Amino acid sequence: MEKKEKVNQITEGVIWKQLLLFFFPIVFGTFFQQIYNTADTIVVGRFVGKQALAAVGGSASQISNLIVGFFVGLSSGAAVVISQFYGAKDKKNVSKALHTAFAFSIAAGIFLTVVGILLTRPALLLMKTPADVVEDSAIYLHIYFGGMIFNLIYNMGASILRAVGDSKRPLYVLIVTCVLNIILDLLFVVAFGMGVTGVAAATVTSQVISALLVMGMLLKTEEIYVLKLREIRFDQRMLSSVLRIGIPAGLESVMYNISNIVIQVFVNNLGTDTVAAWGTLGKIDAIFWMVINAFAISITTFVGQNYGAGKYHRMRKSVRVCMTMSMVGAAALIAVMYAFAPWIYSLFTTDSAVIAHGVHMSRYLLPSYFIYVIIGILSGALRGTGKVLVPMILTCGGVCSLRILWLFTAGQMYPGINTIMLSYPVSWSITAVLFIVYYFMKFPGKKKEN
């Protein structure tokens, strides 16, 4: 019961303190998640070569991000539903939502494994992946999709734990699997000389372990969110609720990734050095995105539980606190990444041309990252209340569609990496303004609390 009281402080305690208590484990988790993700890139970049670096960090990375991003969006639907029922102390519906979420993860994992393996090579060719990179990219993705079901189970399980206020145990899982992934990367690639195959095998093995650990935590808990294998099944009403919130979030992620894939196609036309630098940039600035995402997860859970408890004024106040913390964190990250860009890129590769391209890209884009903070936090807050359709439309129109339009107009008239990169701050600025207007119009906070 003591543990339950601690979790329920999200709806009762001092806002800034409870946000930080929930947020910090996620921040540390993002750190280990990024080490986990970048270990593959560092190992192939330094011990295999720039073709392998481009294979793991280029088109293959965009395709895997597209698939996983959609499912993470869907899992956020389950997290919102569970957090609202948990805040309302509705034990029966927490259980129904949890078991429906796991049934969906298993079914989706099987489907994506089959489809992913079949469509990998056509997708790589469609993206105009450089010829010297296609084969390694296909090998990496075939193995990656082979372990997709474990990836989805872990992401769903971790989302559920965070939804009920437990951000610590997902962190512990990330630490274990991060260390394991690095050890296996070095063993398979450096010791056994397995190249891209070794990197993919290390990633999948680590995902299997992470899925088993998260499932074990949910199976052994004595709380109302206990997982029972025999009860894993679809509940039609719960599935509808999860998909109502999850599909718009998933489509939002897909549109982000589609726009990034279109950008990758334009980058692929600029040569292997630029492709390798762009892929490395994606690994480096993922640190920033994952920290902001940690704030967004925090505010989604915080808003969701308080929404379920009927504490609307507390929700709005928590958004202001979270936005302030996010901006401070963003400033610190941007300063470090800007100042130490050459050294950071040298960790990934010794190729001077790749490093030079990468440093230019980072320093061009970093100042505009503040704008995205507004989108991330307001989107997370709105998602916690179940308002997902309009934010999805704003994101798809303001960020994704505008970005693609920019590439096929300005990108054609003024070809080059600077024009490609400019699509980010332009689309973010317009979308941020739209989110601010919608937030002040529709976000609960002026209603009388229960």
List PLM regions with ranges:
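Transmembrane alpha-helix boundary and packing residues in multipass membrane permease domains
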Residues: 26, 30, 42, 80, ...
